[in-house]
Amino acid sequence: QFDANIIETKSVQWNAGINISHNKSKILDLAGDEMIGDDDYGALKYIKGEKLFTFYLRDYQGVDPETGNAMWMDKNGELTNRVSQARYIKAGSPEPTVTGGFHTDVTWNGITLNVQLEGKFGNKVLIAENNYVQSDGYQMSMNQSASAMNYWKQPGDTNCNPKPVARNSTSSNTSTSTRYMENGSYVRIKDVTLSYSLPKRWLSPVGVNNLKVYASGMNVYTFHDVDYFDPERGVKGMGYGIYPMTKSFVFGLDVTF
């Protein structure tokens, strides 16, 4: 952690600070086992020598450009369209490698701007909800996401979802695969507050000691690449149906007599 007063004059004050932490965990022993499971949809494992939580998932390899079927890597390193033959791989951890924050306050002639940022880096998240809303035809009674419409339509199509088939007998939408895994790193503008304190010489004649007007926003914006409302998915990186962080905006008046 580092804090500094950058400018300190009668009319201008500016300070800023940053904090960074490195997170590291390792499972040393599992009472003789090399790996044991976790209850969360079978997606997480406790693996000796790895971080506390490790995603252990079927190895999804995209869409066959000729047929539109989902492809998987099998134990022999060969591609297959049968999910039952897909190999399982260690696919990263929901634990961030680095977490940090930044804050700064600038005051000029009674006007103050306060900004706070926070971030996490190096973690993976599993958007398990997508097996419902990008179901490739399995969830026929449920609305699908806009991204589900980007599916295979003709030979040669790539970088898309598998072709939708009624009831999806191929199980391409299984939640325990790398298909719905994403980089969970993000930077969030956690708080922005702009305030103005009226000069005391204006207030003294009316018996007011201090008067400040302000506007504040929380969770203003988040920079991330996760195909979901919010990249924060809980300690296990899944948080099935987790409610996203709420944005709030406040305008206020603070008066002291």
Residue ranges and their predicted role:
Residues 1, 15-17, 101-103, 191-195, ...:
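Membrane-embedded beta-strand positions in outer-membrane beta-barrel channels/transporters
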Residues 5-94, 134, 144, 151-153:
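Conserved small-residue
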Residues 6-8, 20-26, 108-110, 119-123, ...:
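Transmembrane beta-strands of outer-membrane beta-barrel pores
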Residues 12, 96-100, 185-190, 245-249:
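Residues that define the transmembrane beta-barrel architecture of outer-membrane proteins
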Residues 14-16, 102, 108, 113-115, ...:
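Transmembrane beta-strands of outer-membrane beta-barrel proteins
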Residues 40-67, 144-157, 161, 172-176, ...:
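C-terminal beta-signal and terminal closure region of outer-membrane beta-barrel proteins
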Residues 120-212, 217:
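Extracytoplasmic gating/loop element in the C-terminal half of outer-membrane beta-barrel translocons
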